[in-house]
Swiss-Prot record:
Residues 172-230 are annotated as: RNA-binding. Keywords: Nucleus, Phosphoprotein, Ribonucleoprotein, Ribosome biogenesis, RNA-binding, rRNA processing. One of its GO terms (molecular function) is RNA binding. Residues 264-278 have a biased composition (Basic residues). The central region (136-221) reveals a striking structural homology with the core domain of GAR1. This is H/ACA ribonucleoprotein complex non-core subunit NAF1. During assembly of the complex, component of the small nucleolar ribonucleoprotein particles containing H/ACA-type snoRNAs (H/ACA snoRNPs) which contains CBF5, NAF1, NHP2 and NOP10 proteins. Interacts with SHQ1. Interacts directly with CBF5. Interacts with hyperphosphorylated C-terminal domain (CTD) of RNA polymerase II large subunit (RPB1). One of its GO terms (cellular component) is sno(s)RNA-containing ribonucleoprotein complex.
Amino acid sequence: MSDDLFSKALENPDQDLNVELPKDDVDLGLLGDGGNERKTDEPAADAERSTGLGSGSSESESDSGSDSDSDSGSSGSEDDSADQDVEGEDEGGDAIENEDEDEDPSPSGPILSKNEILEETVPELPEDYEISEKTIITPIGVLKSAFENNIIIHATMSGEKRVLKEGSIFCLEDRTLIGMLTEVFGPLQNPFYRIKLPDSKKNLFDELKVRLGEKAFIVTPDAHWIDTFELKRNKGTDASNGYDEELPEEEQEFSDDEKEALFKKMKKQQQQRKKRDNRKLANDSDNVKVKRARQPKANSLPKLVPPLGMSSNAPMQHGYKSRNARENIKRESSATSNRNGSSPVPITQLHQQQFSANNYPFPQQPNGMPYPPYSPFPQPTNFQYPPPPFGQATPAQFSNTVPYGSLPPAYNNMSPPTQQSFMPMAQSQPPLPYGVPPMNQMQNPMYIQPPPQAPPQGNGNFQQVMELHQILLQQQQQQHQYQHQHQQDPRT
């Protein structure tokens, strides 16, 4: 743009050019004296520039040189003022820093943490403490080293079972007092004991330092022991955090950003997994509570009804009968017999089931052998022999041709029953169900089952039934007697 103005001025030197120069937005008041000088120079430069337009190119060149000189001078003045301001600010900042340093003086000595102890407390024995000749002392190790008022004793006894506890008293063989135990360290097989001496016992430390290698003893009454398994339970650490604890996870620092990101990701996953597990446990507990609430109460459950044969009030049926049911049946039968006024009925030894020790229904033979067993139901015809012993011939079968109501011919040769008892029905045992064996037969497997009793058909026919039963028993006795005689004499 400046080239166009100069070319126009050269072409028309007599013509005035109305040129609007750009305004400077910089606040010259902040620049100090240089700004004022620039303000005074600007009108003069404008006048010279307007007068120089009519005087040729040489004058314009001189004007441009003067303008450049003025601009350089003004810029130089501005730079000087800016440098002065920066130097002033630096001096002010240094002054503020000096004031801060004066307000917070640096602490004297080493920096200590909150729980750090600068000096170790030294346990001291009473001044009048002495080891008499009667006091029992026990060898424990040898003097290993001495440094900075510390005496190290290397134990010769194993500490796998127990070790000395702080506060135990050590001495030499001549009962020279060493001091109290301060620390135990080293392996359990041969631990080390450290004894800290106070500064007031410098002479004792020098004496013990000369006597290194001698045996060390403990005062047995003042020795304190601790079991090793208690030490193994509390595992130590070498961390140097507060209270000698390791840094928590949230305070750990990483030198690698990737490792830190991976650690945070794993920690986040663990937290999410833990929340998921807690939510699952809560849901399970809710389900259990709902299930328990839905369970019916004991009062609303239907009552169990015992089987018909096991109920105390049930009628007599085939099967097991409880004791109460049997007693009730017995009472009912006795009451009905008393009301009917029935006469005593003779009952043989077979019905009493008490006439022999071996519970056989028939009398013993002279040789002590019982009768052979027979079928539980009476067979009116075609009685068969039992299987004969090995090597004997089978006898021929015979049929029962004795008419009803008459006694067989061999009945006269039979011996009468040895004993009969007449007992009223009220005192007899109640009849068992049809086909059920008596209790002593259940208990004794060798018991021969008697013929089943026919169910009662009324009080009028009961005596006839009993007489018929007696006849059947006599016939069976005759049959068994004949079989027994035939087995003893097979030639007949």
